[in-house]
Amino acid sequence: MFQDNPLLAQLKQKIQETLPKKEGTIKASDKGFGFLEVDSKTSYFVPPPYMKKCMHGDKVVAFIRTENEREVAEPSELIEQSLTRFIGRVKLFKGKLNVAPDHPQLKKLSLKAKTKKGLNEADFQEGDWVVAHLVRHPLKGDDGFFVQISHKITDANDKIAPWWVTLAENDLPNSEPAGIDDWQLKDDADLVREDLTALPFVTIDGESTKDMDDALYAQQLPNGDFALTIAIADPTAYITPEDEMDKVARERGFTIYLPGRNIPMLPRDLADELCSLMENQVRPALCCSVTIRKDGVIGDDIRFFAANIKSHARLVYDHVSDWLETGSSEQWQPSEEIAQVVRDLYAFSQARANWRETHAVVFPDRPDYRFELSADNDVVAIHADMRRTANRLVEESMITANICAGKTLQTTFGFGVFNTHAGFKAEKMADVVELMAVNGAPNADAETLATVEGFAALRRWLATQETSYLDNRIRKYQSYSEIGNQPLPHFAMGLDVYATWTSPIRKYGDMINHRLLKAHILGKAPVQTPDETVGEELALHRKHHKIAERNVADWLYARTLADEPAKETRFQAEIFDINRPGMRVRLLENGAMAFIPGALILDNKERIECNGEDGTVLIDKEVVYKLGDVLEIVLTEVNQENRSLVGKPTQVFADLVSETQTSAEQPAEGAENNEPQV
């Protein structure tokens, strides 16, 4: 009877006009209530009845009123809803379609749903994975929440779910682009391709690699220098900037690499066949030749040219590594011609690695963790693959090639697609200088560290320290690597300029650089120039791909390690992050990440302190763990819903003995001599 009473509505409006308003973000609890977080120090309680009008993550304006002598927030206006397009699972209530969002704070919600036009509700079963869109919200004046299902991802128990769901969540494709029936070579009429089919190029890749995009040749000269030629697959020979396939490649940005599978940027018939530098097959290629001095310095005779080449040997990383490291390989016996090419490539790579270790930055070796899957998408094993001699040989070749491209694009055009890194964040430089001064780092003043040479020298000094603690500490002061169209330095690599062009089958930015390098060869204006937005586009693609890769891995780790808490399996783990709630570690055996709450290190808030600023864990004010430490842990929880791992150290910290206890436990004076006590 009071619901539509205009007088009551008028009175309510007048009361609300007198109430203060606050803007903030809703943080939900699993108990029905929530909080309006205004800033890092201010929050207001949101009672359960008011929480029914909003959900976790919503940005809202709320009235602040007093109820039961407590300030509470009543959300009144929606600024930005947390859910728009989202991934969820079907819930059926009395035959009616509902969707539960696949989000840790929202999983308990069950939102009424319908399918979009063209989908049949009967095709959706309990637990099916779907893409949904929130189309009604109470704070928009709607009667409750309501969602529309736009797409079914896969069935409830499909083991492919980790891949398909993660790709859908990040709005990424789950298959290669469609090819065309008849690929045509579209070279510029003035482009001359040199015939290098007689030169004994070799490819070195993984055993199952099909999209072989680089072939190498080196010859050590009588004076000890090296004549190096790098040949790179040439998809821009078939794809022009105006082609529809170019738009597809730009939209994808990169080949997507996920645990156990990849989603190509280009059609497989192009990437794995027509452009792949297969053994004994003539292929168009973009090439770079350069002399590398025996001391590892790159010569000034950098030359880019187009060619037709033929790989004379399709080699495998492990076979080549075995042969170089032990003198033989059971799986591979090279001809003398190929053996000499590999020996010279190896000698060149050592010269370059030595130069980079002395003058630039060499990243520490870390294993690549590889999931081995069954035909049913179950994890059979997780392998920790260390980079071996052949991997480093190829890496040095690619880095050399990309330095050559960077220099050429910088000189010829002053633009291109460059990988850049700005070193330390300007606002953090004072912190870096202070930290390094305390720890005795040489030449670590702000002016020096603002140069590539000074930054690289500090990184080399950090690499000589006994532990990786300072290295880990300093990382949070560094900028992120970027992609841009200006030839800026790459501080993290210790290089003045760096432009990748060695993976055009897998990276759209490399395709752009190929077109620029061809313009350089022809002495013509480029058919494509990188605009201001291309770097941001590619960086965003790369970010989403990395998130997808990590999310699939987390899902597979949760599946694979589900039984380990019950088994109390012990793992060696490295600390890579410490914050106030606890520390994050990486299991060295398989690469899984786990969180260790402070309470599972020592359940006494008075005694333990997790200091994120210093990267240390202290007990009774003594450092017990720090960034980079390796410790033994057991997993205590594997949460399949959230795809997360929780662990605790096997080390047990003793209870603090009070002075009173200590006095009581000490023998009275003379007791050890059995003297009578008076």
Swiss-Prot record:
Q: Does the keyword Cytoplasm apply?
A: yes
EC annotation? 3.1.13.1
Q: Which residues form the S1 motif domain?
A: 568-650
Where is the RNB domain positioned along the sequence? 193-521
Which InterPro entries did the record assign?
CSD (IPR011129), NA-bd_OB-fold (IPR012340), RNase_B_OB_dom (IPR013223), RNase_II (IPR011804), RNase_II/R (IPR001900), RNase_II/R_CS (IPR022966), RNase_II/RNase_R (IPR004476), RNR_Ribonuclease (IPR050180)
Q: Which UniProt keywords apply?
A: Cytoplasm, Exonuclease, Hydrolase, Nuclease, RNA-binding
Which positions are tagged coiled coil?
none
Disordered: annotated segments: 659-678
Where does the record place it?
Answer: Cytoplasm
Question: What catalytic activity does the UniProt entry give for this protein?
Answer: Exonucleolytic cleavage in the 3'- to 5'-direction to yield nucleoside 5'-phosphates
Q: Which GO terms describe its molecular function?
A: exoribonuclease II activity; RNA binding
Source domain of life is Bacteria
Q: Which GO terms describe its biological process?
A: mRNA catabolic process
Matching entries from Pfam families are given as: OB_RNB (PF08206), RNB (PF00773), S1 (PF00575)
Its main localization is cytoplasm
Q: Looking at the UniProt record for this protein, which Gene Ontology cellular component terms does it annotate, in alphabetical order?
A: cytosol
- Say which family it is in: Belongs to the RNR ribonuclease family. RNase II subfamily.
Please give the HAMAP family that the UniProt record associates with this protein.
Answer: RNase_II
Q: Cross-referenced PANTHER family, in alphabetical order?
A: EXORIBONUCLEASE 2, RIBONUCLEASE
Q: What does this protein do?
A: Involved in mRNA degradation. Hydrolyzes single-stranded polyribonucleotides processively in the 3' to 5' direction.
Protein name (record): Exoribonuclease 2
Say which species the protein is native to.
Vibrio cholerae serotype O1 (strain ATCC 39315 / El Tor Inaba N16961)
Gene name tied to this protein? rnb
